Amino acid sequence: MKNTRFVNWWKQDKRYITLLKAVLMALLPLVCCLIRTAAEGRSIGQVYLPSSEWNDELFYFKQVEGIVNYGFPMGYFGFNESHALQLSFAAWSPVLVFPWILWGLVFGWNLLSPVICNIVLMTVTMFVFVWLVKPTWKQLGILTVLFGLYSLFVRY
């Protein structure tokens, strides 16, 4: 009987440690975004999509905007401003922007929507990842450093 109580206590205690790890890792995307924007002298609310170094973000933003407002993309989204053969997705499928479409339909769509949506999706993903994998503190530290150093994740 004593042995069973100890085992149950141990399992329950590990669950709270895993929860703590998952919450800490879930905050990482937001913290990295805050650090990156602070290094640029801005806040997350001042991220302006059209002035992006790459043009893909605006391209996807306009596709989602058309889908949210009209049910399908409006405009020319093919290569060299050509029109796609079917619908207006060119070489891309609607699956690529599907999470943004759902976000836009539920919460509305503006220039900050992709940024907030990406942070929320990365936060949920990090939480679920740590909850399922249950990494050690050392592994969690390594993941944190690697995520922080990979600026493409932080940028998006």
Language model region names:
Residues L27-A39, V124-L132, Y150-F153:
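Residue-level signal for alpha-helical transmembrane segments in multi-pass membrane proteins
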Residues A90, P94-V97, N110-T125, T144-Y156:
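Aromatic- and kink-enriched transmembrane "portal" helix at the membrane-lumen/periplasm boundary
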Residues M1-I44:
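Start-transfer (signal-anchor) and selected internal transmembrane alpha helices
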Residues A38-Q46, D56-Q86:
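Extracytosolic helix-loop segments that constitute the early lumenal/periplasmic catalytic or substrate-binding loops
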Residues V106-F107, F127-I142:
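Transmembrane alpha-helical segments of multipass membrane enzymes and assembly factors
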Residues S51-W54:
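Juxtamembrane membrane-water interface segments immediately C-terminal to a transmembrane helix
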Residues L19, V23, I116, G141-I142:
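Hydrophobic alpha-helical transmembrane segments
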